[in-house]
Amino acid sequence: MAIKVKCFASMREYLDLSEREIATDGIRNVADVWQSVAGEKPMPDNTLCAVNQNQADAKFSVSDGDEVAFFPPVTGG
């Protein structure tokens, strides 16, 4: 039973993490996933989250087999 976690751009550097699978024990939502991989590091206010490639917020429920991604806001010109 696992959730795949991916971090992109500055989130990858902030957490020193590209990709990891975590056990689903005690994981209910995106915020729990963040805490599992980040420990004491707070989630920056502008962090974007996605579950199975759909935008989600920290309260979004997750379950076994989900993919959760964290990335900074996208900018362009």
Role assignments for model-derived ranges:
Residues 1-76:
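Ubiquitin-like/PB1-type beta-grasp interaction modules and other compact soluble beta-rich domains
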